[in-house]
């Protein structure tokens, strides 16, 4: 028999807890980068957040916790420079692909999370969300395959 994990987005300073959580075998907590806050992710700030919010949730549930990390390689969310804002987030928009890709901010997000999580043995696992194994990409997507952030997982 397999395990049933419940997924829950982590978007605030607390994680909801419901009575049906007792039926789950563990939790898959979803972390998304905030492109408006790029450069603010450090192992210390992430570690403090994980210790205060995620560890409290872990203690209350006493079940395995897995973290799903998602960080697109956007440079900014500013769409004012585009005449076609309705299609700005499109792999076919060549102008968007060429000026709004920031592989470094994606890598910094993963560095901060991996460094913070590596010393916390109560975290059962880490996953990179949005991974696209069919092709190495250097675009704005969340996939780390073919990008500098991919190498971080090989060095752990």
Where would I find each of the regions flagged by the language model?
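Aromatic- and acid-rich polysaccharide-binding/catalytic face
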Residues: 2-4, 8-47, 60-95
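Aromatic-rich peripheral "rim/lid" segments of glycoside hydrolase catalytic domains that contact
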Residues: 19, 77-112, 116-156
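Conserved phosphate/ATP/ADP-binding segment of small-molecule kinases
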Residues: 50
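Alpha-helix-loop-beta-strand connector modules within alpha/beta enzyme cores
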Residues: 56-57
